[in-house]
Amino acid sequence: MSAAQVSSSRRQSCYLCDLPRMPWAMIWDFSEPVCRGCVNYEGADRIEFVIETARQLKRAHGCFQDGRSPGPPPPVGVKTVALSAKEAAAAAAAAQQQQQQQQQQQQQQQQQPQQLNHVDGSTKPAVLPAPSGLERYGLSAAAAAAAAAAAAVEQRSRFEYPPPPVSLGSSSHAARLPNGLGGPNGFPKPAPEEGPPELNRQSPNSSSAATSVASRRGTHSGLVTGLPNPGGGGGPQLTVPPNLLPQTLLNGPASAAVLPPPHGLGGSRGPPTPAPPGAPGGPACLGGPPGVSATVSSAPSSTSSTVAEVGVGAAGKRPGSVSSTDQERELKEKQRNAEALAELSESLRNRAEEWANKPKMVRDTLLTLAGCTPYEVRFKKDHSLLGRVFAFDAVSKPGMDYELKLFIEYPTGSGNVYSSASGVAKQMYQDCMKDFGRGLSSGFKYLEYEKKHGSGDWRLLGDLLPEAVRFFKEGVPGADMLPQPYLDASCPMLPTALVSLSRAPSAPPGTGALPPAAPTGRGAAASLRKRKASPEPPDSAESALKLGEEQQRQQWMANQSEALKLTMSAGGFAAPGHAAGGPPPPPPPLGPHSNRTTPPESAPQNGPSPMAALMSVADTLGTAHSPKDGSSVHSTTASARRNSSSPVSPASVPGQRRLASRNGDLNLQVAPPPPSAHPGMDQVHPQNIPDSPMANSGPLCCTICHERLEDTHFVQCPSVPSHKFCFPCSRESIKAQGATGEVYCPSGEKCPLVGSNVPWAFMQGEIATILAGDVKVKKERDP
């Protein structure tokens, strides 16, 4: 036996493409042996459905009428499916008809004169008919007759489209489409820009394993039966595993005969298009403009037809059941957000009185944590999912201890409020993993907070708020764990503005009056839901919308001009004239929309612009008092900007961040707008603004002695950008700590490195350079 014969004997034919393949190119995990090319093309989650469709087509068309090889024998344990009674009757009739034709041909041959060594070309097919592929493999006479009849039908209808209807009296084999496959289950190949068919895609391993086991045992338990023959005739019904059908088919009525749409079917959902009374069989709509529903009739007669709709949207929209699930999920999300806003409103309404009556441990913890807000948090598994913590409160049930409640906005600037860490972590997990079924045990294990904005020092929120702190058994960890407040300039308003949706319009700009409190608890949520669901006529809806926009316009100017002052007050900072030891005043609302940084379209244009208001507030932060010796550091750009009437460029506006002092004192005071806007208020300076762009625009100063730094030679802490030290102060700090051991930041703190809890320390080479002596270089010139 030659090598070619050995190679050919080892080859195995694919059940779908009938091409000889080597054993390594075959896959035996399905009900029929198929090659890897077919599996990759069709997809492992759809291959079993394609195999079942091909099996029905081969059975209906008499098996391999094109003369192809019948393929390999089935694997051990696979039982052949017997033909139905209707198929057997049709095959017997076709066999009898073929025998009569053969007898007539033999009689004609006997009547014609025999010619030796010559055969006329015109009589060759009649005298010596070419053997078909079925005769080569010795199939049964019934199958051969069925194949011959199917071949005759195919020759007549191969290039006819749509296929002619098949009457009940004729053969049950349906006419084929131009590609040789019949019915909508022929799976015409999709165009590159079209999506896959809307099947219930599951894991390839689970679906293939389940279907292969069921097929090899010879049973059809758990399969969906009752689907019509792909040809539309009275042939065998299609049996499909339920995990390969869309959810719309599984959830629909059992009497509806539905077939999955072909690959190339597009268009949006439309109403079912029943077949007209005179249309025999109601052929399936395989092509057409968008909006045409794919309808399949289950009965070939013209008297009655059952039509079912397969709704497939353009660009692969989900079935109706999934869309309804999305709508329910969206409705639940709106209700949850309304309830969270109601809780926030209840928490902010009487905060000063309620906090004063709480135990000392609870009050101190809340004051400390409120002084850190707002600060950013992110999802541990996906760092692009950002939110911000902006408020804290303590709640207690009857007979239970106090428990910490925190309010988180996610995404930042969206106005969506979550009243627990687990709630926002679950939403982040769903946005990241697209998994709506799993819940997270503790959100504090999945959230990270940034200790200082821009430093990259992200730490686990569970380390800042362990269980003992959340139940007020212990105090808040040290100042090195507390985050520093940061207010994003792109969305300076906090979600506390959302609680003023149902309040009356605020006072005119500059008065500082606050609108009355909103309804609390169940009432606020009910009012929001009632407003959403009330079926008002269009006129009343438009008038209500205009009224709401007018209220927003009236509140916008006051809110924009006092945005920074109010948000700092909302964080729990002491206001001017307020005692630092007592509880903070209740945070006022900021306006109806937290992310509105531009006025409404029809807002009055005669007031101060929002950028000018923000600049005026930022200008008052130009002078900072040192927490050590009281020597002031003036920002020349800020003072020049206040003393000049020239317009200010947006590039010089500082970032809206609020930073705590190094010694952990969080009772920072707030700088109000300039005296020209509020003549009765005194200017108050924050304790320290070390790394704002406005401070950096002035001369560099040492953090310890506040002397002018040398222009190129100074010590910069890699963890905290505001820690800048001159060589003399650094030398004294190194000597005080001892040059032989670990020498940490000259500020006296153990500043952790970015992304870890390991504190930064000097290297020996750096210590040697600093202790070597003064470096004589010129100092920065005064501007």
Swiss-Prot record:
Molecular-function GO terms, alphabetical: transcription corepressor activity; ubiquitin protein ligase activity; zinc ion binding
CDD domains, per database record: vRING-HC_IRF2BPL
Sorted UniProt keywords: Coiled coil, Isopeptide bond, Metal-binding, Nucleus, Phosphoprotein, Transferase, Ubl conjugation, Zinc, Zinc-finger
Involved pathway(s): Protein modification; protein ubiquitination
Polar residues composition bias: residue spans: 594-608
PANTHER family: E3 UBIQUITIN-PROTEIN LIGASE IRF2BPL-RELATED, MYELIN TRANSCRIPTION FACTOR 1-RELATED
Designated name of the protein: Probable E3 ubiquitin-protein ligase IRF2BPL
Organism: Rattus norvegicus
